Amino acid sequence: MKVAVLGAAGGIGQALALLLKTQLPAGSDLSLYDIAPVTPGVAVDLSHIPTDVTIAGFAGMDPTDALVGADVVLISAGVARKPGMDRSDLFNINAGIIKNLAGKCAEVCPNACIGIITNPVNTTVPIAAEVLKQAGVYDKRKLFGITTLDVIRSETFVSALKGISLADVEVPVIGGHSGVTILPLLSQVKGVEFTAEEVVALTARIQNAGTEVVEAKAGGGSATLSMGQAAARFGLSLVRALQGEKGIVECTYVDGGSEHATFFAQPVLLGKNGVEEVLAYGELSEFETNARDAMLEELKANITLGEEFVAG
């Protein structure tokens, strides 16, 4: 099993690479790519960690060497948020990066599963889809927007608020991966009751948690370490499913035939070909139904923006 991380020299990429080096199954290959010249050095640094994961690093303008033979590609390349920016402000730079890297994946590893971390995910995933379609290699089962950060934040915040073990907390998160398009289904958390006020406050905190980190870092970065952990959780789940492990479910932003939008985040059963089945997300509370319906205009606009970017 070969996993490639594109954007591996950045804050998310290095955290992700560390977690993959220590947690990928024995015998895996881990390939790191970034335009930054430090990237081969990041690989050397990680190579000193005693795990049975082979690692190589590549720098420069062409990621081809990193992508050859890749089964999974995780893309975190791009610029990060700074104070005063929202995820859509990143679009102008990151859209072009994703377009180029998706094109390289289509050319070098057309059968790989691709997980996109680069924001704005609501838009960068449709960009990748359009590029793969143009190349004639699009398989909607193999393209994912990684929204796991919303899930782990939800789990953490619910556990802290209610004083319950994280082992007992599961929070499905549906919709998209920015602002009001992030919808944690708090009504589905087992064994916990929330007041109406708690639901409103907790939903808002989860939706704005990225801004919380950006402001706390005072211009020094965005959520890199928690995002690295979230991407590792998703990537490792995907690897296990590709290797035949059954019953692995993660929430992720996919082209899954949703009645709401072309791309929509919801629970997905992973399998040997990527998405095995897009799962129903169950009954919503009145608050959640209203929030879902209210987000759709923005989510659809984000998707259209990506499609039009590739169409030119």
Curated annotation (Swiss-Prot):
GO cellular component terms, semicolon-separated: cytoplasm
Binding site for substrate: 81, 87, 119, 153
Single biological process term from Gene Ontology: tricarboxylic acid cycle
Reaction equations catalysed: (S)-malate + NAD(+) = oxaloacetate + NADH + H(+)
Keyword line: NAD, Oxidoreductase, Tricarboxylic acid cycle
Gene Ontology MF: a single term: L-malate dehydrogenase (NAD+) activity
EC number(s) per entry: 1.1.1.37
Uppermost EC category: oxidoreductase
pH effect summary: Optimum pH is 9.5-10.0 for malate dehydrogenation, and 7.5-8.0 for oxaloacetate reduction.
Binding site for NAD(+): 7-13, 34, 94, 117-119, 227
Pfam families: Ldh_1_C, Ldh_1_N
SUPFAM superfamilies: LDH C-terminal domain-like (SSF56327), NAD(P)-binding Rossmann-fold domains (SSF51735)
Active site residues according to the UniProt entry: 177 (proton acceptor)
Activity under varying temperature: Optimum temperature is 35 degrees Celsius.
Known partners and oligomeric status: Homodimer.
Similarity-based family: Belongs to the LDH/MDH superfamily. MDH type 1 family.
HAMAP family: Malate_dehydrog_1
Chain's role: Catalyzes the reversible oxidation of malate to oxaloacetate.
Name of the protein in question: Malate dehydrogenase
Species in which this protein is naturally found: Moritella sp. (strain 5710)
Organism ancestry: Bacteria, Pseudomonadati, Pseudomonadota, Gammaproteobacteria, Alteromonadales
